[in-house]
Amino acid sequence: DGNGPKLDAFRAQTDNDNWAYGQWFAKGLNNLHHKVLNQSAYTRKDGSVIIAYTVESQSPCGYKIRDLGISSGKYEITRSRDFGPDDFKFTTNQIWTVYTDGSIELQANIISNEPSLDLARLGYVMKTPEDLGCYTYYGRGPHNNYNDRMNGAFVELYNSTVKEQFVNFPKPQSMGNREGVRWCALTNSEGQGALFISAASPLSASALPWSAMQMVEAPHPYQLPESDGNYLHLDLKMMGLGGSSCGQ
């Protein structure tokens, strides 16, 4: 039970994201829908298959979010207005290569019609079966680290679990990020699963038992719903945390 990679630019806002998260909801980053505009496919002489897509990612509407009080951890999220073709969206050109050994390569060119918007992240998220709960990665660790808080996290091979990536903050928020990830793997107890490798620069990566919106909607950890799978984020970039409540 799960899904393949979907474009993602949203995170569960941190205590330092007060300056930015209103725009993330206003632009619908919390609810992107993905539509294939065109596609093509062909088979190489070596047997590998090339599949190309142009995908448009846009929310059906914008949202307003209101903090109901610092101590409550609750937010009120409402629809603001329906979106049209000129509202915020991403357009992605994807090239998938399926090799004869079963490995799959994804190359993506991602643009938006509002490049000045400060994004929480830019990458892909996929939901994976809950039994793929063993998380191994070669990158910075073993604790949470972001691009502005990573000097004390060293590049090594780390073995963990998805559940161990969760940090018991009073209010669930963005967590579990690892910078400088060269590769990561999700496997079951028998070592079967999937390996994800960065073919270019190192990634920002995280694996958690809940989605970003599930964490936004839970005032406290004990109010999180029962996990329905694991959520793996593979990002080109993740925004830093900042050093104060204004996020700067």
Where are these regions (language model features)?
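Beta-strand/loop-rich accessory regions of lumenal/periplasmic or secreted enzymes
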Residues: 1-248
